[in-house]
Regions:
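Beta-propeller blade repeat segments, especially FG-GAP/WD-type strand-to-loop junctions
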Residues: 1-3, 41-55, 93-113, 150-166, ...
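Repeat-based blade/solenoid architectures
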Residues: 7-20, 38, 59-71, 115-131, ...
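Gly/Ser/Thr/Pro-enriched helix-cap/hinge segments flanking short amphipathic alpha-helices
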Residues: 10-11, 314-333, 337-470
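Residue-level recognition of a conserved intra-blade site in WD40 beta-propeller repeats
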Residues: 22, 27, 72, 77, ...
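Acidic/hydrophobic-patterned starts of short beta strands in beta-sheet-rich repeat architectures
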Residues: 27-36, 77-87, 137-146, 188-196, ...
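Residue-level signature of beta-propeller blades and closely related beta-rich strand-turn architectures
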Residues: 39, 89, 149, 199, ...
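A generic tandem-repeat structural signature
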Residues: 63-126, 130-133, 143-144
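Solenoidal tandem-repeat scaffolds enriched in leucines and small polar residues
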Residues: 109-218, 223-235, 241, 246-252
Length: 470
């Protein structure tokens, strides 16, 4: 499936890297790859003249920071995404270094947590993953931080422009050893939350529509307290219009929770799929543009794995160069870095510190330093369409759900708010069309329930869908 093209990265020395997020850092409308470095510089990799070049300034690079997870979203309604970076120098409990929340004013970046009025709100509990969350559907996001040994945190901007933790008010302040977190409309018409925990049950928080949540994992059948959960990703694998959940675990069985009509989930992974492994993160994406998303399991110290949905079940596929049997896998994302309509696979490597141990990064990280990897799928003539919904403020509408109908078949994607473990994919719904090069309809549903349909959009391009005017 994959061919190594890591030479596209202009400078790529061995380094301890963790999460990867995809966002527009410099405001030019194109996306960059932001790579978290553990006590080494964070990278902002931009596609320039056929190469990925680091454009991070000193503030974003933050070389002293033990960066793990990161996510982007527009928290202040200015039309540009802010960037949340989780720093963590402890496996659990209280940590020394605060997280960063970078905001851009003009061309000048600031860390909002470093401002006097926000210093008291900063997170000092060990944490790893972070996801964007628009709990009301207003187009202004908060950042949901998955902590270890403390409550989940939900950082939102108040009307006075201060950062406050709204998790307790929202009913999201559960305490556990949270690892992967994702947010999308999975059991309600608004953004719900799924977290996987290390050694404890998974959690599913249903959005009640008024900014409050209720935890329903056990009654819906996904609590599953046995494995040490790491990563979680949502996709509609079977095409029934309901999002299913895949959970990657560290030395436990991998899980495929299939959602049924009525809202319950059934664990239905086959023997090959569920095989235990040291899985750090999971990516769901249609790499070959055949109209069905593949699942990439990024492993630590053992070969990666790839599955495709074939004949109503998951079947293992050949990875090609991306197997990386000696790779110390950490973060991973899929993104179309060169605009050709095919998704590249970008992999980070570093220390897992025993998987847990800590969340990633880890001390003595120099011995676990490896370069980043970039892989391209083998070329096909399959059609594609990429859909980018925007908020009322013109920023990416993370958490929006996009449905596409082509050849009478309907596919669904959620625009990534946070996924896998420590990562956040591009804010675009990517659809392969197989042999087709025509689309009957695209439907976008925003987190507030607003729906727009676009009939017969041209294929093989990026379709931007603004929020409709009132």
């Amino acid at each position: 499936m994959f061919l190594d093209c890591s030479s596209l990265i202009a400078e790529n020395p061995p380094r301890p890297s963790n999460g990867i997020a995809v966002t527009d850092i410099d405001g030019d409308g194109a996306f960059e790859l932001v790579v978290a470095g553990y006590c080494t510089a964070n990278l902002v990799l931009k596609w320039v003249d056929g190469r990925l070049v680091d454009i991070a300034g000193p503030l974003l690079a933050d070389p002293a920071g033990p960066a793990l997870g990161l996510a982007a979203a527009d928290i202040d309604g200015d039309g540009r995404e802010e960037l949340y970076v989780v720093n963590c120098d402890r496996a659990t409990g209280t940590k020394d270094m605060a997280d960063r929340l970078f905001a851009c004013f003009g061309k000048h970046w600031l860390d909002l947590f470093a401002q006097a009025e926000n210093a008291g709100a900063a997170n000092h509990t060990a944490a790893g993953a972070v996801a964007a969350m628009d709990r009301w559907g207003h187009g202004r996001y908060g950042f949901l931080v998955a902590t270890d040994g403390g409550p989940l945190r939900l950082y939102e901007l108040t009307r006075r422009g201060r950062l406050e933790d709204g998790a307790e008010e929202a009913g999201l302040d559960s305490i556990g050893a949270a690892r992967g977190v994702t947010a999308l409309s999975i059991v309600s018409d608004h953004m719900d939350v799924v977290t996987v925990n290390d050694g404890g049950p998974n959690e599913l928080f249903r959005n009640l529509g008024d900014g409050n949540f209720e935890e329903i994992a056990e009654e819906r059948g996904i609590a599953d307290s046995r494995p040490s959960g790491r990563a979680v990703v949502a996709l509609d694998a079977d095409g029934d219009g309901l999002f299913d959940l895949v959970v990657g675990t560290w030395d436990g069985a991998q899980r495929y929770f299939q959602q049924r009509m009525g809202g319950g989930f059934v664990e239905s992974a086959g023997a090959d799929f569920s095989m235990p492994g040291r899985i750090f993160t999971v990516v769901a994406a249609d790499f070959d543009n055949d109209g069905y998303e593949e699942l990439f399991f990024h492993a630590h110290g053992e070969p990666n794995r790839l599955f495709g949905w074939r004949n109503d079940q998951w079947q293992e596929l050949e990875l090609g160069d991306a197997a990386e049997p000696k790779g110390l896998g950490t973060g991973a994302v899929a993104a179309d870095i060169d605009g050709d309509g095919r998704l590249e696979l970008i992999l980070a490597h570093g220390s897992s510190h025993g998987g847990h141990g800590s969340h990633g990064g880890g001390h003595g990280a120099e011995g676990n330093a490896q370069p980043l990897s970039v892989f391209r799928p083998e070329a096909t003539n399959n059609g594609w369409l990429r859909v980018q919904p925007l908020t009322p403020f013109g920023a990416p509408a993370r958490g929006a759900v996009v449905s596409l109908t082509a050849g009478g078949r309907r596919q669904r994607r959620a625009v990534c708010a946070g996924s896998g473990y420590l990562c956040q994919g591009e804010p675009v719904a990517h659809f392969g069309l197989g042999p087709l090069h025509a689309v009957e309809q695209v439907e976008v549903r925003w987190p507030d329930g607003t729906v727009v349909t676009v009939d017969n959009p041209p294929a093989d391009r990026l379709l931007t869908v603004p929020y409709p005017p009132e």
